[in-house]
């Protein structure tokens, strides 16, 4: 095949895909990347951070991107990597937990909530984690009293806690401040999965913060050991651009393996060959948007989230919880059936595991008119 024929054939397949701008993708935590990232992607498309000695400039951009994210998270001296996404980030954190526990002689008992992302199920399978599931409060956050009592009743047997800041299904935020105190008092590692919330919570206006939640989650809390945060979600970087940050580089020794045939003799990330596009694009978008840009993006999405919630109630629908961030859960005992019918009508939503509800994520590509059309479709779907 010649080049033009190949491109024409590829276009046929690309045209089968959905486009974010159509406003029909309502269940994804990704969105259309910032236009600047097209140029950055072309500039860095052949770089490989898996062999950083060959791409020293790209590696320096990664370090600066981590420092900028760390600054958002209360610690510009944080150590970490721009990697494939939240799954790899969470696996990396659990791998560090495992190796720290091995050195300290603790059993690999980790407290992880039911609201955690499915990547922790993968971590459990790969690393043979013993997972303790605490009960949830009515706000779908971990019961801190249960955790405190459990740790007290099982001294030196808990090696780590995972808290969620912006849970995938509902957007709820665990009380990381209290979990931090428990971690410090008992010499326990604390990982925060803020894959989605990390580029939302720091930029939220106070008027959108609910009194039932503690919004602190970052390295300003002494007990936080590591944080997952994805620039390719609300950070507007292209896929794949996930992030794993540790409080300091003392965790590196728990991740390193020998890599004698590369330009650096030790390697820490789960994926060896890593495109430099994610790191460069994260650097570029963060430099361009800055705090004011992200505040506008986040709070525009929150305004639309509140609009959707208000209109849902006018239509007679209920939400499982008031929106904590830009995620809305629509109570529906027949969630899977409704989800399938909506998909037949062109709207792609998802469902929650921990509650009977449809799950809507209001990303920057969603406009008010998209919400109105969706509401009419949902209302008609539930009428029959």
Swiss-Prot record:
PROSITE patterns: DDC_GAD_HDC_YDC
InterPro entries hit by this protein: GrpII_AminoAcid_Decarb, MfnA, PyrdxlP-dep_de-COase, PyrdxlP-dep_Trfase, PyrdxlP-dep_Trfase_major, PyrdxlP-dep_Trfase_small, Pyridoxal-P_BS
Record keywords, A-Z: Decarboxylase, Lyase, Pyridoxal phosphate
UniProt cofactor(s): pyridoxal 5'-phosphate
One Gene Ontology biological process: carboxylic acid metabolic process
N6-(pyridoxal phosphate)lysine found at: 233
Catalytic activity, as annotated: L-tyrosine + H(+) = tyramine + CO2; L-aspartate + H(+) = beta-alanine + CO2
Cross-referenced Gene3D superfamilies: Aspartate Aminotransferase, domain 1, Type I PLP-dependent aspartate aminotransferase-like (Major domain)
Keyword check for Glycoprotein: no
A Pfam family hit: Pyridoxal_deC
E.C. designation(s): 4.1.1.11, 4.1.1.25
MF GO annotations: aspartate 1-decarboxylase activity; pyridoxal phosphate binding; tyrosine decarboxylase activity
Pathway: Cofactor biosynthesis; methanofuran biosynthesis; Cofactor biosynthesis; coenzyme A biosynthesis
Assigned protein family: Belongs to the group II decarboxylase family. MfnA subfamily.
Its biological purpose: Catalyzes the decarboxylation of L-tyrosine to produce tyramine for methanofuran biosynthesis. Can also catalyze the decarboxylation of L-aspartate to produce beta-alanine for coenzyme A (CoA) biosynthesis.
Protein's name in the database: Probable L-tyrosine/L-aspartate decarboxylase
């Amino acid at each position: 095949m010649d080049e033009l024929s190949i491109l024409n054939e590829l276009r046929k397949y690309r045209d089968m895909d959905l486009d974010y701008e159509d406003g029909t993708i309502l269940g994804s935590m990704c969105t259309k990347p910032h236009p600047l990232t097209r140029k950055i992607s072309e500039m860095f498309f052949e770089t490989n951070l898996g062999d950083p000695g060959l791409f020293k400039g790209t590696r320096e951009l990664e370090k600066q991107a981590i420092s900028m994210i760390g600054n958002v998270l209360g610690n510009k001296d944080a150590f970490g990597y721009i990697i494939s996404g939240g799954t790899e980030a969470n696996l990396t954190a659990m791998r560090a937990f495992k190796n720290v526990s091995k050195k300290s002689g603790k059993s690999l008992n980790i407290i992880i909530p039911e609201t955690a992302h499915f990547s922790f199920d993968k971590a459990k399978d790969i690393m043979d984690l013993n997972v303790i599931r605490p009960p949830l409060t009515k706000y779908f956050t971990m019961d801190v009293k249960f955790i405190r009592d459990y740790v007290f009743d099982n001294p030196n047997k808990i090696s780590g806690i995972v808290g969620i800041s912006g849970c995938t299904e509902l957007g709820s935020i665990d009380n990381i401040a209290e979990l931090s105190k428990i971690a410090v008092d008992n010499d326990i590692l604390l990982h925060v999965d803020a894959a989605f919330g990390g580029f939302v919570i720091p930029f939220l206006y106070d008027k959108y913060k609910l009194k039932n939640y503690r919004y602190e989650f970052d390295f300003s809390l002494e007990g936080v050991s590591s944080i997952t945060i994805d620039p390719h979600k609300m950070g507007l970087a292209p896929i794949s651009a996930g992030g794993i940050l540790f409080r300091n580089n003392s965790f590196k020794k728990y991740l390193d393996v020998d890599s004698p045939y590369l330009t650096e003799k030790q390697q820490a990330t789960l994926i060896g060959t890593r495109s430099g596009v994610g790191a460069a694009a994260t650097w570029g978008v963060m430099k361009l948007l800055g705090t004011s840009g992200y505040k506008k993006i986040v709070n525009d999405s929150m305004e639309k989230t509140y609009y959707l919630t208000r209109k849902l109630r006018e239509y007679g629908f209920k939400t499982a919880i008031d929106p904590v961030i830009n995620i809305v859960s629509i109570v529906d005992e027949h969630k899977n059936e409704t989800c399938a019918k909506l998909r037949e009508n062109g709207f792609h939503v998802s469902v929650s595991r921990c509650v009977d509800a449809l799950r809507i994520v209001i990303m920057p590509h969603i406009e008010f008119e998209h919400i109105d059309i969706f509401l009419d479709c949902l209302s008609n779907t539930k009428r029959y």
